[in-house]
Amino acid sequence: MKKLLAGVFAGAMLFWSVGANAAEDHYKVKLVAGSPGYDHIEPFMAELKGFWKKYGVDVDFIGGNYIRSNQMMSVGDYDVGYNQFASAIRYNAAGVDNVIVGASSANCALVVANPAIKSWADLKGKRFGIVTKFDAQYMTLVHEILPRFGLSAKDVNLALVPVPETASAILTGDVAAAFPFEPYGSFAVQKGAKLLLPANDMIDKKHLDTDMLRNGIVMRRKFMQEHPDLARKIMWAHMDAVEVMRQHPDEGIDVIKHFNPKIDESLIKESYKNCGWEYQKAPKVWIDTLIKWMKQDGILQKDVTYDQVTDYSLQEGYPGYPGWEKHGK
């Protein structure tokens, strides 16, 4: 009888051990992001500070180009991406398996102008530099900022200007004004450009109770369904990085410096002030507004709703930074 019980016990232990090992998910997560600026800093911080390793997640990470990040997520090559919200919404409406799961920095951009520009009215008929068309920043400009100051997109000549060239384009008169993301707006101001609209005034909050959020973390639903534990840990590592940026700015600035050694440290610190870190989720009013603007511009293949393009369920239970210590693996 003892031998029988011992055999049963040994078999049960073997079954439990195999089951436990089978429960461990060793899938290598494919993650893509743009360049290591404030909008996409979270995965670079997670890699540099070892957040993913502390959560026990193996990540194949590439970064460096936001256009490539958008493209790779649009064709399903990667599980997780740091993308423009407008792109994520547009891809979702086109049937791509992308959903917004978290937010990044807020505002983090300036409107700058040639010193000869005295008022917004002076911009009528002039060239106005933008990063690209139909992203969240472009739509904020044409649907929110220009109308607030008595202009429309037809009143200015919108021109694509590479953000690193903003200062020279402004000061040489190639464009009268521009709307670059940070730190290039602050750099232009340092070089003599006029600050026409500060970061915290991107949105008139008397009429729209939100900030401008351009980028965030996006996941494929298929990945979330097939690897829920890994998806949650990737999400929490992102949330940890946002909390570091909010609570410990010097640590966040050090990460920016590490990946951008040629950028003046004072510029990095100055531009940090123009980026908000209050959001782990993009507000419903903001996503609804982006969808409304995109419908007006005719760039959605079908109607979509906030609930269809967002899923914040992975954020549930987040214990705060550092998540890996408070929850364990």
Segments from the language model and where they lie:
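Immediate post-signal peptide segment of exported/extracytoplasmic ligand-binding proteins
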Residues: 20-31, 53-56, 116-127, 226, ...
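Secondary-structure end/capping motifs
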Residues: 225-301
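Bilobed "Venus flytrap"/periplasmic-binding protein-like clamshell domains
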Residues: 25-49, 62, 110, 120-190, ...
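Pocket-lining segment of extracytoplasmic ligand-binding domains
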Residues: 86-87, 165-169, 175-257
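Alpha-to-beta junction loops
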Residues: 57-58, 74-83, 95-98, 126-129, ...
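Hydrophobic/proline-rich hinge and linker segments of small-molecule sensing/allosteric domains
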Residues: 100-119, 210-221, 225
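Bacterial N-terminal signal peptides
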Residues: 7-16
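Conserved C-terminal helix/tail region of periplasmic/extracytoplasmic solute-binding proteins
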Residues: 295-329
